A protein has these predicted regions:
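Positively charged n-region of N-terminal signal peptides that target proteins for export
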Residues: 1-4
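Hydrophobic h-region of N-terminal signal peptides that target proteins for export
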Residues: 10-18
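Flexible, solvent-exposed loop/hinge segments and secondary-structure transition points
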Residues: 18-130
């Protein structure tokens, strides 16, 4: 019986630690949402997690986290796609995640779509948990 209680306690503490890893609030009021555990969208190879920085209802910036995508292709995503979200209102950023074609990312279709899904998941998470 004690063993079951200890296991339950460990599981609960792991879940609460997980929630803190997803969204944090910086001293300046910026929320940082990490999609490592909340979005399973895959690029060409594996997941393409991002950090979405949000302040006062605007996306400040999107930062690509460590992934295993092909470097030359993912570089296009970082160079052309991620800056499109800088300083956008959340509603406009959400609409942009739903676009099927994004200029400038030719050849990086899988990565682009996966990153868009990650950004969408981050915005949704922020809106539900802020």
């Amino acid at each position: 019986m004690q063993r079951a209680a200890v296991v339950l306690l460990l599981c609960l503490s792991a879940l609460s630690a997980h929630a803190g890893d997803v969204m944090t609030k910086k001293a300046d009021g910026t929320y940082v949402v990490r999609t490592t555990t909340i979005c399973k969208a895959r690029g060409y190879r594996k997941g393409t997690p991002v950090e979405v920085h949000i302040k006062k209802g605007n996306v400040v910036k999107v930062v690509a986290l460590k992934n295993q995508e092909t470097v030359p292709y993912f570089s296009r995503v970082k160079q052309f796609l991620l800056p499109l979200y800088n300083n956008l209102k959340l509603s406009k950023a959400k609409k942009l995640t739903e676009k099927t074609k994004v200029d400038g990312c030719t050849g990086a279709t899988f990565s682009t779509k996966a990153v868009q899904k990650n950004i969408h998941a981050a915005i949704e998470y922020y809106e539900k948990n802020k």
